[in-house]
Amino acid sequence: PSLKNIFKEYCDDLSEHDPMNGDLSNWAKNGVLLLNTVLTVEESRPGSHAKKGWEEFTINSIKFVLEHQPDAGFICFGMPALRLAEKVIMELDIKHPILINTPHPSPLSVYRGFYGSKPFSRFNAERKKRGLEVVHWALPTYEQKTLF
């Protein structure tokens, strides 16, 4: 459900079509990394794999990206993501990072500010303001799918 809500906000924010097929390879080609603070979960048990080591893995992954791509930025969906990003930013002493924060897109919090938050256009506006290349967020339709 959260990814569907991200897609809805994507469509509303950027006036894009509904990607329908879930192919995010264009985002990856544009340097976008989607990463949860915890990468696995038991079905119907949110947070069931928290504090099992995933947070440290995620922190180290973000550090690796920032050490090799210092202009990388963050779109944080929810407070756990924001806290984790802020921790890495402080540890690496990054000055003036691009940090876009929204409520989490889960069904429980989507109407508490996620819808209408425009994270994609805000992220690009910040990159453009800094003279950085913007992310090309367009996603393929079924007919354009090129994964295989």
Task: Set out the residue ranges of the language-model regions.
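A polyanion-binding, active-site-adjacent surface
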Residues: 1-76, 81-101, 105-110, 114-142
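DEDD superfamily 3′-5′ metal-dependent exonuclease/proofreading module
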Residues: 143-148
